[in-house]
C-alpha cells in the first residue's frame, strides 16, 4: 500500500525526522488560507499523486510549456495561481502512463535554501536477506539513471535486524553521503530514526529523494515515498486509514476484496493463472507471440468457484481486453473448480471475446468435460505454447 508524500512526511516526523512546515489542501481557497500561515517568502506547491517524476511531469490540460507538478512560489498570490492550474487537472509523469492521474490535493510547504541534494532509501535486500540502506550523493534525480551511468556513486549498507543501526553503520552512511559538521550530527541521529519507522510500520520501501543539506548546515527530509507490506496491514489500522482509493485502479481494489493478486497492465489479452511464476511465464509467452497481456492475475492455490468467478468478472470489466487466456496447473487447485468458476462467470456476464482455456493437473479430465459439455464457445489448448498461439491468433482474427 502506498501513501501520499505529505502523509509519509508526517509519519516520519512522529519518529523525529526533520521536515518543513506544510499543509495538505483540497481547494484553491484552502491553498490561500493556509499559505498565509506559513512564514514564506518561498513556498513549494506539490501535486499529491501516487507517482514519481512529478516535477518533470506535464498537465494534460495546460500548454506544453507550463510548469510541472512541483512548483516554487514567491508569494501567496503565486501559490493561489499555481493551485488554480494544478487542482483538478491531470498530471502525466514517467510513472503514470499516458492516462496520467488527476490532482485532487496539493501539499504546500516552506521553501528551503538547498546546498546539496542526497538520496536515501531503505528496502529489503533479498540478496542478503536483510533491510538495507541505499544512499548516494546524487540526490534529486532518477536513481535508476545514477545506477546505470555511475554505479560507483551508490552505496548499500545492510543492517543486522538483531542489532539495528549501529554506530558503525551510521558512520558508514554519513561517510557515503559526505556529511560533515552539523549535517553529520543530524544524519547520525536520522538514520536510526528512519530504520525504526521502517521496521515498526512494516514498510517495504522508504525513499527520501532528496534528503537535503541546507545552507545553514542542517539536514531535512524534502520528499518522502513510503510503501507498506500489504500482508502486515492488519497490524496497522492507523496506516490503513491513510489509504487513498482514488489513487488505485478500481479493478485492483475489487480484486483485493477476494484476495486475488491482480495488477492492471496496458495490453489486450486478459490472463487468469494460478501461481505467480506461471502467471509471469504466461505473460512472457503472450508477448513472444506478438501480443500484450492486459493484466497479471494469480487466483492462488486454493481458489473457490466464487473466487474464480470474481476473477473472470474483473478481467472482462476491462474494456481493453480483446481475448482471455485461462492457464491452470492443478496442484492444490483443482481443474474442475476452475472450469465451474469460468462457466458460472461466462453465463453471468456473457462472453464477448475469444476465450482459450488450458488445464493440466488434478481433475483435468473432469475439468475438460465440464467445459466441453457447457455448450460455451471455448477454445481448448493442450499446453502453454498452444494456448498462447491460439489466443493471439483469435484476437488478431487469424
From Swiss-Prot:
Record's InterPro entries? ATP-grasp, ATP-grasp_succ-CoA_synth-type, ATP_grasp_subdomain_1, Succ-CoA_synthase_bsu_CS, SUCC_ACL_C, Succ_CoA_ligase-like_bsu, Succinyl-CoA_synth-like
Keyword Ligase listed: yes
Reported cofactor(s): Mg(2+)
Q: Which residues form the ATP-grasp domain?
A: 9-254
Q: List the Gene3D superfamilies.
A: ATP-grasp fold, A domain (3.30.1490.20), ATP-grasp fold, B domain (3.30.470.20), Succinyl-CoA synthetase domains (3.40.50.261)
Q: Which reaction does it catalyse?
A: succinate + ATP + CoA = succinyl-CoA + ADP + phosphate; GTP + succinate + CoA = succinyl-CoA + GDP + phosphate
Question: Does the record's keyword annotation contain Zinc?
Answer: no
MF GO annotations: ATP binding; magnesium ion binding; succinate-CoA ligase (ADP-forming) activity; succinate-CoA ligase (GDP-forming) activity
Which amino acids does the record list as binding Mg(2+)?
209, 223
Query: Could you tell me which pathway this protein works in?
Result: Carbohydrate metabolism; tricarboxylic acid cycle; succinate from succinyl-CoA (ligase route): step 1/1
A single Gene Ontology biological process assigned to it is: tricarboxylic acid cycle
Residues that coordinate or bind ATP: 46, 53-55, 109, 112, 117
The lineage's top-level taxon is Bacteria
* SUPFAM superfamilies to which the protein is assigned, alphabetical: Glutathione synthetase ATP-binding domain-like, Succinyl-CoA synthetase domains
Name of the top EC class for this enzyme: ligase
Provide this UniProt record's keywords sorted from A to Z.
ATP-binding, Ligase, Magnesium, Metal-binding, Nucleotide-binding, Tricarboxylic acid cycle
Q: Which GO terms describe its cellular component?
A: cytosol; succinate-CoA ligase complex
Question: What family, per the record?
Answer: Belongs to the succinate/malate CoA ligase beta subunit family.
Its quaternary organisation is:
Heterotetramer of two alpha and two beta subunits.
Query: What does the function comment of this entry state?
Result: Succinyl-CoA synthetase functions in the citric acid cycle (TCA), coupling the hydrolysis of succinyl-CoA to the synthesis of either ATP or GTP and thus represents the only step of substrate-level phosphorylation in the TCA. The beta subunit provides nucleotide specificity of the enzyme and binds the substrate succinate, while the binding sites for coenzyme A and phosphate are found in the alpha subunit.
What is the name of the protein in this document? Answer: Succinate--CoA ligase [ADP-forming] subunit beta
Q: Gene name on record?
A: sucC
Amino acid at each position: 500500500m502506498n501513501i501520499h508524500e505529505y502523509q509519509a512526511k508526517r509519519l516520519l516526523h512522529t519518529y523525529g525526522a526533520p521536515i518543513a512546515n506544510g499543509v495538505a489542501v483540497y481547494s484553491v481557497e484552502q491553498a490561500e488560507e493556509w499559505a498565509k500561515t506559513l512564514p514564506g517568502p518561498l513556498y513549494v506547491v506539490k501535486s499529491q499523486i501516487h507517482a514519481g517524476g512529478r516535477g518533470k511531469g506535464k498537465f494534460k490540460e495546460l500548454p506544453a510549456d507550463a510548469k510541472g507538478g512541483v512548483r516554487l512560489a514567491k508569494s501567496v498570490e503565486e501559490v493561489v495561481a499555481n493551485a488554480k492550474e494544478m487542482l483538478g487537472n491531470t498530471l502525466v509523469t514517467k510513472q503514470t502512463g499516458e492516462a496520467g492521474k488527476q490532482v485532487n490535493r496539493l501539499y504546500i510547504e516552506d521553501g528551503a535554501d538547498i546546498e546539496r541534494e542526497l538520496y536515501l532509501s531503505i528496502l529489503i535486500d533479498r540478496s542478503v536477506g536483510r533491510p538495507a540502506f541505499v544512499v548516494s550523493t546524487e540526490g534529486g534525480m532518477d536513481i535508476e539513471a545514477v545506477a546505470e551511468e555511475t554505479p560507483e556513486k551508490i552505496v548499500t549498507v545492510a543492517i543486522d535486524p538483531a542489532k539495528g543501526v549501529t554506530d558503525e553503520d551510521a558512520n558508514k552512511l554519513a561517510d557515503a553521503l559526505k556529511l560533515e559538521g552539523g549535517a553529520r550530527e543530524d544524519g547520525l541521529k536520522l538514520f536510526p530514526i528512519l530504520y525504526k519507522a521502517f521496521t515498526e510500520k512494516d514498510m517495504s520501501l522508504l525513499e527520501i529523494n532528496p534528503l537535503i543539506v541546507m545552507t545553514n548546515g542542517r539536514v531535512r527530509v524534502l520528499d518522502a515515498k513510503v510503501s507498506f507490506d500489504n500482508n502486515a496491514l492488519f497490524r496497522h489500522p492507523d496506516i490503513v486509514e491513510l489509504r487513498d482509493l482514488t489513487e488505485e485502479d478500481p479493478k485492483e481494489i475489487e480484486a483485493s476484496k477476494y484476495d486475488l493478486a491482480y495488477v492492471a497492465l496496458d495490453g489486450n489479452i486478459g490472463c487468469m493463472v494460478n501461481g505467480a511464476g506461471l502467471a509471469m511465464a504466461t505473460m512472457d509467452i503472450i508477448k513472444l507471440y506478438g501480443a500484450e497481456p492486459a493484466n497479471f492475475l494469480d487466483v492462488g492455490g486454493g481458489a473457490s468457484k466464487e473466487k474464480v468467478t470474481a476473477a473472470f468478472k474483473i478481467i472482462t470489466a476491462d474494456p481493453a481486453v480483446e481475448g482471455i487466456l485461462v492457464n491452470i496447473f492443478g496442484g492444490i487447485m483443482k481443474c474442475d473448480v476452475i472450469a465451474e468458476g469460468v462457466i458460472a462467470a461466462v453465463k453471468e456476464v456473457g462472453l464477448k471475446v475469444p476465450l482459450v482455456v488450458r488445464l493440466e493437473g488434478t481433475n483435468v479430465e473432469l475439468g475438460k468435460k465440464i467445459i466441453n459439455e457447457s455448450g460455451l464457445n471455448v477454445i481448448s489448448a493442450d499446453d502453454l505454447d498452444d494456448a498462447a498461439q491460439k489466443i493471439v491468433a483469435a484476437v488478431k482474427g487469424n
